[in-house]
UniProtKB/Swiss-Prot annotation:
It comes from the Bacteria. Composed of two chains; the small (or glutamine) chain promotes the hydrolysis of glutamine to ammonia, which is used by the large (or ammonia) chain to synthesize carbamoyl phosphate. Tetramer of heterodimers (alpha,beta)4. ATP 1 binds at residues 129, 169, 175-176, 208, 210, 215, 241-243, 284, 298. It comes from Streptococcus mutans serotype c (strain ATCC 700610 / UA159). This is Carbamoyl phosphate synthase large chain. Disulfide bonds: none annotated. GO terms for cellular component: cytoplasm. Mn(2+) 2 binds at residues 298, 300. GO terms for biological process: 'de novo' UMP biosynthetic process; glutamine metabolic process; L-arginine biosynthetic process. Belongs to the CarB family. Residues 1-401 are annotated as: Carboxyphosphate synthetic domain.
């Protein structure tokens, strides 16, 4: 069927900010879809609130709106643009829910807008638990016994009927939000109450637990002519009971017999046909390991995280083809872009194994609840490709960037047997490493399978890895066992550990004996047909399929898995760098390990190597490709950390040199550089042990800011108020040593701002200065940032520009750099310099219209700013005001404290743009799900040192019609200053009148809570904050953010005064 000609303009709804459960995979899907629709000649209008995406670049769609994805703003855009249709199936749960809302509000009918891809009725049937159950019964597809409930009592009654354990699944939520497994009535009451609150339709499904079954996923496609195919099937290493986003996954399935595979394949195709989905769809099934019994768990009627994984695992571009199907094209008339010869109707075949391992944020959240269940907790994931399970699993382990390079964590050798077993039974994020440790201790795989219900086949692979370790230990220097270990994915470093030599020595032994990897192509057809994709993975076999081209090449290192502190912003910069390399006439090669991102789409670069970002893996590619050099500036700390070992091995690092990177990162060298350049910084010292730290702090004076050197995202950074707290920090938070000193700085309470600059060594272009709303002490990634600055004097801005130029030239910076300043009493101090692209690059690029990463890349390759038509100095400001606001995923992470401080906690960002600061702030708050009504109740519970300031805020809230509630000390202070506040209790003093009770009752519109001493973990405060998060009540832990919210409310209200 040819494409439709009755529609001309299509709106694509994006997925908004990155949160746990909805990450970069939707930037990849949305970008593909917009380009595919443009390719077919349609006019595309894109709405998305996340500036850190490639999708929101001007060239991706005909019109790009970076606006909140709320009914208010999407309706405005619909009325203005009048599209013929909306494609909502590529914006994750956000896009789907928005489409449903627009439809229910009658807006689509009123404007005559059609929904493409999947009909509303199908979305309802897949997402509404009741309708889904009905459909499965009609299709005679088995589902676990279940019941839909709208109250906690109904849930308890049903569970009593079928018996525990049961699973709670709220309707229309993302990534299992609010759901969970309940072993008894107490757990059920707690989880069901929370789930009903988080479900937009106050509905949950209570179902019999089938934990322990194999969890299998099928990624299927269907078109309007009812052609349907399976793109990829996947098997979870972890059985049912752990969210698939938190499970290790292998593709294709590994333990199914042909009969089982056909049975589940038929079920999946039957379901997609019954739902009449046009596009991609993901079906999750549970299979009894001891019989042919299976259950359908759920269906996602849209492109999902699994679709991104399936696309990268097979090379089959699901989102691109789904977009074309939505406008009427069929699978048998579209060419598969990977082979360029076969049609899209051809099911992919794999001659390799793909492993995906989730990346969790618990390195940032010491107190977080690490136990895994049906609610997703991972922020990102890595994927690795090998010719066997062992190889792909070990490559994935070393891609995680959690300080391991094998399926082993050395510190687990100190764990007792009892603790080891407990951790294996109650799965946490690091269970793979506990299982491997148990095998090393001699536990049998049968015992472990009984404890975990993980298939013996997978545990046998872990045993095989251990057997190779044992053999390596017995045969030091043996070439045959070296070959065997490399064929099974062992890193040189691991072999070196066992053989008690250096990794360099192992590498030399390998190269001397010609044990080098070959690169195989991902071609969707198991090499059956000629294929044109330049998409490769390494393995230790014979024939090499990656041929070095005649053209000179440049390698760009990506940023690996998405985690807190290193998000999709770095992928954005990577993709732009590649474009500039290609424009400059070089071949652009990307190395990365993240399946969710645009950079690992094989059509972005000239060659893609899907490999771990470690010295060994990168070096292997460099030896094959012999590039002009490597660019490390755009891959965050991941790539920067590789600069030194690569340079040491003789590789050319393009842009800022390693010695200069060191001058910015090494504390003593940096201090010296600032002294030489005559630039002030807060007084500080380095300490290599506890006593030195205490001596430094006494000299500087408390409060001090303490942190380890060489980190990203403010890891283990704290503001410390006293000597006792400092001692406690030195003992618990860091492992200080002469190699890893701790920095002790005077903590200046001032306003903070930052600059991204681009330098060619002579001239320095400063696109703009971003002013932070929260004062120093809140990590820059968690602060709201405003461009152009609203309160900085012209003199301060001129000083910032002057210091930026001095630093860029003084540190010999070629390319990008990011500098953070604090301003106190009109004096500008430099806090830190990062000689690389930072997380603000996409935001600043968009608001100034300067393609920063592309310009930086051209400078790195030898151009000058003058040649490119840019002047030295600060670029003229834009007319509009732009606000970048952070977005957090606390609802997904139990026991993580939402208090803001110097350690970064946000997972994503949104942007608001308008003619005034207040309007831009309003949009930024709306886009980040901080919605405050015009009146209501606000609770203040404030630390002594901020009560004065809080009083002024409370008065302003009161003036616009809010009622003020406060805890005892705060209420007393307010009363002494003539502001009446209703007294509420903190916790448990009076259960009907404490803060959690108010929060549960829905009577509170916001909570403002500040804390004095951050070191003493205050359980009351943490419980108050977590009750606000659980019930979706806006929570402000920085008074500056609350001040911004009051400004918005004031600007939207009218004054009513008696004369």
């Amino acid at each position: 069927m040819p494409k439709r000609t009755d529609i001309k303009k299509i709106m694509v709804i994006g997925s908004g900010p990155i949160i746990i459960g909805q990450a970069a995979e939707f930037d990849y899907a949305g970008t593909q879809a917009c380009l595919a629709l443009k390719e077919e000649g349609y006019s595309v209008v894109l709405v998305n609130s996340n500036p850190a995406t490639i999708m929101t670049d001007k060239e991706i769609a005909d019109k790009v709106y970076i606006e909140p994805i709320t009914i208010e703003f999407v309706t405005r855009i619909l009325r203005k643009e009048r599209p013929d249709a909306i494609l909502p199936t590529l914006g994750g749960q956000t896009g789907l829910n928005m489409a449903m809302e627009l439809s229910r509000a009658g807006i689509l009918d009123e404007l005559g807008v059609e929904l493409l891809g999947t009909k509303l009725s199908a979305i309802d049937q897949a997402e509404d638990r009741d309708l889904f159950k009905q459909l499965m019964e009609d299709l005679e597809q088995p589902i676990p016994e279940s019941d839909i409930v709208n109250s906690v009592d109904e849930a308890v009654a049903f569970a009593a009927k079928i018996g525990y354990p049961v699973i709670v699944r709220p309707a229309f939520t993302l990534g299992g939000t609010g759901g969970g497994m309940c072993a008894d009535e107490k757990e059920l009451r707690e989880i069901a109450e929370n789930g009903l609150k988080l479900s937009p339709v106050t509905q949950c499904l209570i179902e019999r637990s089938i934990a322990g079954f194999k969890e299998i996923e099928y990624e299927v496609m269907r078109d309007s002519a009812d052609n349907a195919l399976v793109v990829c099937n996947m098997e979870n290493f972890d059985p049912v009971g752990i969210h698939t986003g938190d499970s290790i996954v292998f593709a294709p399935t590994q333990t199914l017999s042909d009969i089982e595979n056909q049975m589940l394949r038929d079920a999946s195709l039957k379901i997609i046909r019954a739902l009449k989905i046009e596009g991609g769809c993901n079906v999750q099934l549970a299979l009894d390991p001891h019989s042919f019994k299976y259950y359908v768990i759920e269906v996602n009627p849209r492109v999902s995280r699994s679709s991104a994984l399936a696309s990268k695992a097979t090379g089959y571009p699901i989102a691109k083809l789904a977009a074309k199907i939505a406008v009427g094209l069929t699978l048998d008339e579209m060419i598969n872009p990977v082979t360029g010869t076969t049609y899209a109707m051809f099911e992919p075949a794999l001659d390799y194994v793909v492993a995906k391992i989730p990346r969790f944020p618990f390195d940032k959240f010491e107190h977080g609840e690490r136990r895994l269940g049906t609610q997703m907790k991972a922020t990102g994931e890595v994927m690795a490709i090998g010719r066997n399970i062992e190889e792909s699993l070990l490559k994935a382990c070393r891609s995680l960037e959690i300080g391991v390079y094998h399926n082993e964590m050395p510190e687990l050798t100190n764990v007792s047997d009892d603790a080891l077993v407990a951790k294996i039974v109650k799965a946490q994020d690091d269970r793979l490493f506990y299982l491997s440790e148990a095998i090393r201790r001699g536990y049998s795989i049968e015992e472990l399978s009984d404890l975990t219900k993980i298939d013996l086949f997978f545990l046998d692979k872990l045993l095989h890895i251990f057997e190779i370790e044992t053999e390596l230990a017995a045969k030091v220097g043996d070439i045959a066992i070296l070959k065997e270990a490399k064929h099974n994915g062992f890193a040189d470093r691991k072999i070196a550990d066992i053989w008690q030599m250096t990794a360099d020595a192992v590498r030399k032994l390998r190269l001397d004996n010609k044990i080098i990897p070959v690169y195989k192509m991902v071609d969707t057809c198991a090499a059956e047909f000629e294929s044109a994709t330049p998409y490769f993975y390494s393995t230790y076999e014979w024939e090499n399929e990656s041929i070095k081209s005649e053209k000179e090449s440049v390698i760009v290192l990506g940023s690996g898995p998405i985690r807190i502190g290193q998000g999709v912003e770095f992928d954005y910069a990577t993709v732009h760098s590649v474009k500039a390399i290609q424009n400059a006439g070089y071949e652009a090669i990307i190395m990365n390990s993240n399946p969710e991102t645009v950079s690992t789409d094989f059509s972005v670069s000239d060659k893609l190597y899907f490999e771990p970002l470690t010295f060994e893996d990168v070096m292997n590619v460099i030896e094959l490709e012999q590039p002009k050099g490597v660019i490390v500036q755009f891959g965050g700390q991941t790539a920067i950390n590789l600069a030194e070992p690569l340079s040491h091995a003789g590789v050319t690092i393009l842009g800022t040199q390693v010695a200069d990177l060191d001058r910015a990162e090494d504390r003593d060298l940096f201090e010296q550089a600032l002294k030489d350049l005559n630039i002030p910084q807060p007084p500080g010292q380095t300490a290599t042990n506890e006593e030195e730290a205490v001596a430094s702090a006494r000299k500087i004076g408390f409060p001090v800011l303490v942190r380890p050197s060489y980190v990203l995202g403010g890891r283990a950074m704290e503001i410390v108020e006293s000597e006792n707290d400092l001692r406690s920090y030195m003992r618990t938070a860091v492992k200080a040593s002469p190699d890893h000193p701790v920095l002790v700085d005077s903590y200046l309470v001032g306003s903070e701002c930052e600059v991204d600059a681009i330098s060619d060594g002579k001239d320095v272009l400063i696109p703009g200065i971003m002013e932070h709303i929260e004062r120093a002490g809140v990590h820059s990634g968690d602060s709201m940032a405003v461009y152009p600055p609203q309160t900085l004097s012209k003199e301060v801005q001129a000083t910032i520009a002057d210091y930026t130029k001095r630093l860029a030239i003084g540190l010999n910076c070629i390319g990008m750099m990011n500098i953070q300043f604090v301003i106190k009493d009109e004096t500008v101090y430099v806090i830190e310099v990062n000689p690389r692209a930072s997380r603000t690059v996409p935001f600043l690029s968009k608001v100034t219209d300067i393609p920063m990463a592309q310009i930086a890349t051209k400078l790195i390759l030898g151009s000058s700013l003058t040649e490119l038509g840019y002047k030295d100095g600060l670029y003229p400001e834009s007319q509009n005001v732009h606000v970048k606001a952070p977005v957090f995923s606390f609802t997904k992470l139990a026991k993580v404290d939402s208090l803001l401080g110097p350690e970064m906690k946000s997972t994503g960002e949104v942007m608001g743009t308008d003619s005034t600061l207040e309007k831009a702030l309003y949009k930024a708050f709306e886009a980040s799900y901080f919605h405050l009504p015009a009146f209501g109740n606000v609770i203040f519970t404030i630390a002594d040192d901020t009560k004065e300031e809080a009083l002024a805020l409370a008065r302003r809230f009161s003036n616009i019609g809010y009622s003020i509630l406060a805890t005892e000390g705060t209420a007393k202070f307010f009363a002494e200053n003539n502001l009446e506040a209703v007294l509420v209790n903190k916790l448990g003093e009076d259960d009907d009148n404490d803060i959690p009770a108010y929060v549960r009752s829905g009577k509170v519109q916001a909570i403002i809570n500040t804390v004095g001493n951050k070191r003493t973990f205050d359980e009351d405060g943490a419980a108050i904050r977590s009750s606000a998060i659980e019930h979706g009540v806006p929570l402000f832990t920085a008074l500056d953010t609350a001040d911004a919210m009051v400004r918005v409310l004031e600007s939207r209200g009218f004054i009513t005064q008696a004369i």
